[in-house]
Amino acid sequence: MDKKQKILIVDDAKFNRDILKEILGDTYNYLEAENGNQAIQMIGENIGIDLMLLDINMPQ
């Protein structure tokens, strides 16, 4: 069985993060960050993030 790829979703709006997960479905494992600082921390703690989707206009 293949390992699910890991996607980090970075957006300050929870609604947007939820919509992305709904669109992409159960094919992937998800990590979520609500700002850039949290995303940087998560990248350091989680080896093997395959893709990062991020909002380019966030307060932090």
Question: What does each model-found stretch correspond to?
Answer:
Residues 14-31:
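Two-component/phosphorelay signaling modules centered on CheY-like receiver
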Residues 46-51:
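Short acidic/histidine-rich motifs immediately flanking catalytic phosphotransfer sites
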Residues 58:
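Receiver (REC) domain active-site loop signature in two-component systems and cognate sites
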Residues 13-14, 37:
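A short coil/beta-turn micro-motif at the C-terminal edge
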Residues 1-8, 13:
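Non-catalytic signal-transmission and effector/linker regions of two-component phosphorelay proteins
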Residues 55:
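Active-site residues of response regulator receiver
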Residues 10-11, 33, 52:
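Conserved sequence signature across two-component system core domains
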Residues 32-41:
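Helix N-cap/capping motif at the beta->alpha junctions
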